[in-house]
């Protein structure tokens, strides 16, 4: 029986829901979340209507000053329309070159953070950055930096400004309110259940990043936290002045309903995109799916559904066209952008409905300006444009902000500084030896209040991303600024407030304790985060207390030049490798409940690629040449393979040759010229496209105590599933698994698409779910790779049984 108390939705043989409760938790009926058609009724997307509506948008909302641009695309409708009066002759006043931003995802349907999105309040321009986790205020007249503030993670969405304040959210799970004049923090709200962290898009962030971009109306700020529905998502309304919570919806993560191809499974919101207010509706974009609609006043979920037919690509962008009569300034027609909501299916490019180019244009007075047409003498691809304070601001994808206004003076040009990497100061021999044994790709952590000079020197000796922990929050800000001045912050080094105790498990190739020697409890806590297969916890031998290795499974003690290393030399006890060929993988560490360890879409695989092999903490994957070989596919044969890509199963990091030598010697090398089969199926699956229902043995029914065949809900998925021994994994609408050791029921990992090939594999102590999405356009809301790790039994996880 599942001792971790999952919420259960019980189904009969026909898949019909019946009432059930787990503990005292209320079970909401499916009817509450059936698509109401409200969202569909809002989507009137004809391009001709857009032209008609845009002519009406010169009248601004009563709540906004025409001289400001207080939020992304001007207002809560995200209309990108202003009646700002610009000089007849526009001259370049200044240009500031910032680092180009790297979006969180490769997939353009999730490019909500591809470039800078400034906002303007009075004489100040504010720009957020995911490059160095900062919010910067600039003088609109001169382009000079007035102040800069650093958050605890990337800031991926534009701030909101008004009433002398700036509001923004970060991937650290915190919403900030600061003084617009000097950046002083007025209040913060940790909008998430705990300080638990994971690796998300290559950075250490909260499990619940703020990726529902904030929007403001009538003194209330709305935003959303969390991107994994099965981890919990939270949609908020707070008082802008104080941060006091007015309402919070935390029930939108576990919704049993339709998925692509009419599958039924647990799913829910994946808030990624800018929130929109349309009359009494709060629109919450959901990544590469379609948006959800909430009641603005109460926070009740009114509508959310995934496109059931499949092949209907959604995306992050949503905005509103105002009513045809121009009188209702707060309600209009929700519009999407068909250039955002498109993707390459295996056989063709597929576009969903929407207004082409809606995201890439603004309207100033009676003139629509399309970014593709260029602006003045701006070089590069225009990403964003706005008008405020009698000026036009143009932002390019390469990171340059241009300000145009009325002036004959020579423009001020602030070029990005080019930093010479100086030879780093030497490290102590014992620490240098430990670092030399820690590999080149991945993460290292430094705990114990390191200084900026030490971090600069340390980073000069390694290619690993450095995670530095400092217990003094004020010092964190200072060190971030000092490292940013050296162009090291964010991309090479992250400074986090804390003692390192909330580091995720297994991610660090080296953890260095700078403050003497850790006690037994600290060793135990930090050792959990040390990577298997050679990772180490390192500290000075001076005044070292006795270390009980019995508390540290698999640990070995090593000494070098005055330093001690506790090394996790081999595999995790109980973990298994998976070498393919449909062998069992009874990994004793992979058991329900499971939570996200990392997610990233750097490596994308074709949907019918072969299973990866997993050995010594490394996943070896082969893509198919589906684009290059498309015209050659015939007779049940498919495409050729590309060379193997090697990734770290504990971080998702792509690994080079020096970190994978042992694996390359062992794993087979397929013939890259051989045409591959269309499908890869286990011997138990006879029909490639219509698998039989899973029947992996018998069980004792936890509801009635009787022995019976082990059956459980499995919805659509040409992957019929595979019994790895302890876990049966499959695609059941989403990636899913059934833990046989606990009779867990079917647990959906909602968000990504698992492969046509079974690609949900327990091995090396984690549940591996590589990205098997290329060639598919269905609206799975979060197409990415991820790994999951076992969580405490108190962790909430819903299942269908």
Segments (PLM) and residue ranges:
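Extracellular/periplasmic ectodomains of large secreted or surface enzymes and adhesion receptors
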Residues: 1-58, 64-110, 191, 251-252, ...
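A short beta-strand motif characteristic of beta-propeller blades
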Residues: 94, 100-107, 144-149, 187, ...
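Repeat-blade elements of multi-bladed beta-propeller folds
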Residues: 1-3, 69-73, 109-135, 149-176, ...
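Beta-propeller blade signature
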Residues: 8-11, 183, 233-244, 293-299, ...
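A short glycine-rich, Lys/Arg-flanked "PGG" loop and its adjoining helix->strand segment in the class I
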Residues: 520-535
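Conserved SAM-binding strand-loop segment of SAM-dependent methyltransferases
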Residues: 487-499
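A short acidic, Gly/Pro-enriched loop at the edge of an enzyme's catalytic core
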Residues: 501-510
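Conserved SAM-binding motif I beta-strand of class I
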Residues: 465-470
């Amino acid at each position: 029986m599942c001792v971790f108390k999952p919420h259960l939705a019980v189904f009969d043989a026909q898949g019909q829901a019946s009432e059930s409760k787990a503990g005292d938790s209320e079970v909401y009926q499916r009817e509450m979340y059936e698509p109401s058609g409200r969202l569909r009724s809002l989507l009137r997307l004809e391009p001709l209507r857009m032209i008609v509506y845009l002519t009406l948008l010169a009248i601004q909302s009563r709540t906004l000053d025409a001289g400001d641009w207080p939020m992304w695309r001007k207002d809560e409708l995200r209309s990108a329309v202003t009646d700002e009066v610009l000089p007849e002759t526009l001259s370049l006043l200044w240009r500031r070159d910032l680092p180009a931003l790297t979006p969180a995802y490769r997939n353009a349907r999730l490019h909500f953070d591809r470039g800078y999105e400034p906002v303007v309040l009075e004489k100040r321009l504010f720009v957020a950055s995911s490059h160095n986790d900062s919010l910067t205020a600039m003088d609109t007249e001169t382009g000079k930096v007035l102040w800069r503030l650093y958050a605890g993670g990337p800031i991926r969405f534009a701030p909101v400004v008004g009433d002398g304040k700036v509001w923004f959210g970060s991937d650290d799970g915190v919403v900030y309110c600061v003084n617009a004049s000097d950046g002083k923090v007025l209040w913060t709200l940790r909008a998430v259940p705990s300080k638990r962290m994971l690796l998300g898009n290559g950075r250490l962030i909260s499990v619940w990043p703020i990726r529902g971009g904030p929007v403001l109306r009538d003194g209330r700020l709305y935003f959303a936290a969390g991107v994994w529905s099965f981890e919990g998502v939270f949609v908020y309304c707070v008082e802008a002045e104080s941060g006091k919570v007015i309402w919070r919806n935390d029930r939108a993560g576990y919704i049993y309903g339709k998925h692509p191809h009419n599958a039924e499974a647990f799913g829910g919101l994946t808030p990624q995109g800018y929130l929109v207010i349309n009359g009494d509706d709060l629109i919450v974009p959901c990544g590469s799916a379609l948006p959800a609609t909430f009641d603005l006043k109460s926070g009740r979920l009114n509508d959310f559904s995934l496109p059931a037919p499949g092949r209907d690509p959604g995306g992050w962008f949503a905005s509103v066209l105002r009513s045809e009569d121009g009188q209702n300034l707060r309600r209009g027609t929700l519009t999407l952008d068909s250039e955002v909501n498109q993707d390459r299916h295996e056989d063709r490019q597929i576009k969903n409905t929407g207004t082409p180019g809606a995201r890439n244009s603004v309207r100033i007075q009676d003139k629509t300006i399309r970014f593709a047409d260029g602006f003045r003498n701006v070089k590069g691809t225009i990403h964003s444009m706005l008008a405020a304070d009698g000026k036009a601001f143009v932002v390019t994808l390469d990171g340059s902000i241009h300000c145009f206004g009325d002036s004959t003076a020579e423009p001020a040009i602030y070029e990005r500084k080019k930093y010479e990497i100086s030879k780093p100061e030497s490290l102590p021999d014992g620490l240098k030896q430990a670092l030399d044994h820690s590999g080149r790709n991945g993460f290292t952590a430094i705990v114990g209040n390191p200084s900026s000079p030490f971090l600069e020197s340390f980073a000069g000796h390694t290619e690993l991303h450095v995670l530095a922990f400092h217990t003094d929050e004020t010092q964190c800000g200072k060190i971030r600024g000092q490292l940013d001045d050296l162009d090291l912050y964010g991309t090479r080094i992250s400074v986090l407030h804390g003692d390192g105790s909330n580091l995720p498990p297994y991610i660090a190739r080296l953890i260095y304790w700078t403050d003497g020697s850790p006690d037994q409890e600290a060793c135990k806590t930090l050792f959990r985060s040390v990577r298997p297969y050679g990772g180490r916890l390192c500290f000075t031998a001076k005044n070292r207390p006795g270390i009980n290795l019995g508390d540290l499974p698999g640990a070995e003690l090593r000494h070098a030049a005055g330093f001690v290393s506790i090394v996790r030399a081999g595999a995790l006890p109980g973990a298994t490798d998976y070498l393919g060929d449909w062998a069992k993988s009874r990994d004793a560490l992979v058991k329900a409940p499971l939570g996200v360890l990392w997610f990233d879409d750097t490596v994308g695989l074709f949907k019918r690629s072969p299973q990866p092999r997993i050995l010594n903490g490394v996943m070896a994957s082969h893509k198919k040449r589906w684009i290059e070989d498309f015209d050659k596919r015939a007779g049940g044969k498919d495409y050729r393979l590309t060379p193997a890509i090697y990734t770290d199963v504990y971080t998702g990091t792509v690994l080079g040759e020096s970190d994978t030598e042992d694996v390359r010697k062992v794993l087979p090398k397929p013939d890259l010229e051989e045409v591959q089969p269309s499908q890869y199926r286990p011997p138990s699956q006879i029909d490639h496209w219509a698998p039989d229902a899973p029947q992996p043995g018998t069980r004792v029914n936890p509801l009635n105590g009787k022995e019976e065949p082990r059956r459980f809900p499995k919805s659509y998925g040409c992957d019929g599933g595979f019994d790895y021994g302890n876990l049966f994994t499959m695609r059941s609408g989403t990636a899913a698994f059934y833990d046989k050791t606990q009779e867990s029921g079917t647990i959906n990992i909602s968000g990504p698409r698992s492969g046509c090939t079974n690609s949900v594999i327990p091995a090396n102590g984690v549940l591996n779910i590589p990205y098997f999405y290329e060639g598919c356009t269905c609206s799975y809301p979060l197409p990415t790779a991820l790994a999951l790790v076992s969580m405490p039994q108190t962790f909430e996880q819903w299942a269908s049984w």
